[in-house]
């Protein structure tokens, strides 16, 4: 669901004083029926046993537009570098391939779906082929995919191929996660609509011990711990790992520079574009 949500009359009518449903419950009922119609089509056309169905979403709850945007138990929400902005549900159905009822807690990114689905279709080497340059028709594609083939993970044959994930908020590297540890470089006390602050000391979190990111320096008002500083000091050596991961990712941008700049929702990016256009015009370009 996404702001502004307009339910069809059938589902809007489900909201009444007796059940106390909000737009969320009625919207989920409509979404459930939409998914059901897709599954029904696959079954009626004999495709359901040989089709991989992935149900997921592109970002965490947009809780600043509540109630449309919903809520999340995780800290933050859409547009932030906190878990609430990135953690999403993912359900995979592929009869005879994906074990029914199996729960996986390994790290998976939305970037992984393309190489995974291509592998399921018969080509497990798409990532390396694109790195070398793959010709399709009259065009050659030479690109760096940041996704991993997770086919062995979803079929129950192996653990996740991914150990790291980069949290990008617009064009800012807000955090990096490596296995259980998350290293956060920014803070957004006002959420997506507020300012982004660069912290002097990266905020270190063990997401297995603190999945809701409640623990930090004790300041008398937030969920902090008087023992956090001591724990942080003993774990500080881990920053060598994040330095290596960021350096490795940065190295790929030399051979494969970004095709376009990231989107920005603040006026500084607009001003920079205007200033560039004015300068180019003055030079006669």
Residues covered by each model-derived region:
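Metal-dependent active-site segment of extracytoplasmic phospho-/sulfohydrolases and closely related
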Residues: 30-66
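Active-site regions of oxyanion-processing enzymes, predominantly non-cytosolic
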Residues: 1-13, 39, 43-52, 83
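Beta-strand elements within well-structured catalytic alpha/beta cores of enzymes
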Residues: 1, 28-31, 35, 52-57, ...
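Long, internal low-complexity/basic segments
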Residues: 183, 189-190, 194-203, 207-285
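Non-transmembrane alpha-helical segments in soluble domains
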Residues: 25, 32-39, 43, 114-122, ...
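Catalytic cores of eukaryotic secretory-pathway lumenal/extracellular enzymes that build
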Residues: 13, 17, 79, 87-91, ...
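C-terminal cap/loop subdomain of S1 sulfatases and analogous C-terminal strand-loop tails that border
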Residues: 61-83, 98-102, 106, 111-214
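Active-site His/acidic residue clusters
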Residues: 1-24, 62-64, 68-72
């Amino acid at each position: 669901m996404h702001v502004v949500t307009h339910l069809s009359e059938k589902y809007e009518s489900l909201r009444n004083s007796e059940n106390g449903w909000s737009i969320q419950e009625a919207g989920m009922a409509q979404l459930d029926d939409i998914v059901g119609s897709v599954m029904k089509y696959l079954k009626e056309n004999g495709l359901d046993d040989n089709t991989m169905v992935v149900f997921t979403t592109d970002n965490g709850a947009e809780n600043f537009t509540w109630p449309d945007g919903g809520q999340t138990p995780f800290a933050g929400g859409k547009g932030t570098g906190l878990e609430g902005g990135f953690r999403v549900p993912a359900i995979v159905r592929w009869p005879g391939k994906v074990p029914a009822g199996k729960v996986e807690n390994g790290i998976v990114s939305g970037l992984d779906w393309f190489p995974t689905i291509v592998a399921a279709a018969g080509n497990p080497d798409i990532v390396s082929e694109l790195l070398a340059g793959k010709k399709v028709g009259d065009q050659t594609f030479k690109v760096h995919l940041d996704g991993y083939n997770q086919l062995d993970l979803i079929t129950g044959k192996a653990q996740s191929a991914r150990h790291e994930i980069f949290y990008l908020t617009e064009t800012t590297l807000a955090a990096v996660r490596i296995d259980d540890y998350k290293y956060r470089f920014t803070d957004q006390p006002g959420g997506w609509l507020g300012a982004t602050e660069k912290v002097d000391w990266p905020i270190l979190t063990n997401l297995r011990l603190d999945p809701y990111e409640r623990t930090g320096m004790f300041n008398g008002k937030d969920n902090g711990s008087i023992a956090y500083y001591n724990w942080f000091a003993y774990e500080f050596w881990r920053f060598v790992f994040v330095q290596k991961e960021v350096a490795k990712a940065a190295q790929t941008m030399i051979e494969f520079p970004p095709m376009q700049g990231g989107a920005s929702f603040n006026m500084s990016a607009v001003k920079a574009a205007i200033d560039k256009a004015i300068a180019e015009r003055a030079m006669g370009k």
